[in-house]
Structure formats: C-alpha cells, structure tokens
Amino acid sequence: MDERFTTWLRDFLSRHRAVAGSVHLVDGDHLAIAAAHNLPPQVIELTRAIPLGKGMAGLAWQHDKPIQTCNLKEDTSGAVKPGAKAVDGKAAVALPVKDASGTIRAIVGLAWMDERELPADEIAAIDQDARSLPEA
C-alpha cells in the first residue's frame, strides 16, 4: 500500500461520509490495489489484482462508468463478488478516475453504512472530487 494514496483515501471517504473504500491503479491488464480503508484482510487479499470486467471495480474500468449497488451484502446482480460482501457497508460505488488525456488511471471505491441508491448529482460530486487522486 502507498501511504500517499492511503492518506488521500481516508480524507476522501471522510468528505463523502463513507465508511470504507479502496484505490486500485491500472497496471497493464489488471487493477492493482494501492490503498484500502476499513476493508477486511481477506477482501484486500482477494482484490490485490482485479482483471478487467470482474467485480464492481473491474466493471467500472471495463464500461468507463460508475458501478453502484444499494446493498453489498444482498446484491444479486453479479457485480458484487462474494469476497466484497465481507465489507462492513451497504451502499457502494466504484468509479473510474481519468488522467488529463481521458485514459482511466484508477478506480476508486466507496461504501456507506446505509442502504440506498446514490443519486446522479451525488455520484457527479464524488467523481469530481476523485480527480484529486494523486498521480502514481
């Protein structure tokens, strides 16, 4: 884990009142974990390297759009993998962060304690703030 990303993530989660989250950087053909906050060790281990299209982060990367769930533990869409259900949270979103050229450089994930659908304006605000993610 990279302390720059860990510090940024803690502050980012606090600004959006989220209880857990992660930063995954694009590393060739997979996403590599760079920071995690309040994720169980088994979730960190399972998400060290995420292939394109797998789980919420992999889908956000593949489709270049935020992927959300109202409830991590009860999601049946297939986007939430079994390991992620161990996260102590309900509503969650994974969203792409792009570099200046528009290429996805990272996926940021956030989870909240309450069950809800995130409105478009809240996702837009989170997306705007995620652009402050430090460069690798």
In which residue ranges do the predicted regions lie?
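Signal-transducing coupling segments at domain and membrane junctions
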Residues: 41-43, 70-91
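Short hydrophobic/aromatic beta-strand element in the GNAT-like acyltransferase core
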Residues: 20, 94, 107
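A short, aliphatic-rich beta-strand micro-motif
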Residues: 90-99
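Short amphipathic alpha-helical segments
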Residues: 1-14, 20, 123, 130
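Regulatory sensory and allosteric helical modules in signal-transduction proteins
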Residues: 26, 42-75
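Juxtadomain coupling helices with adjacent low-complexity linkers
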Residues: 106-136
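Residue-level signal for well-ordered, solvent-exposed loop/turn and beta-edge residues enriched
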Residues: 30-32, 65, 103
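GAF sensory/regulatory domain recognition
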Residues: 10, 22-44
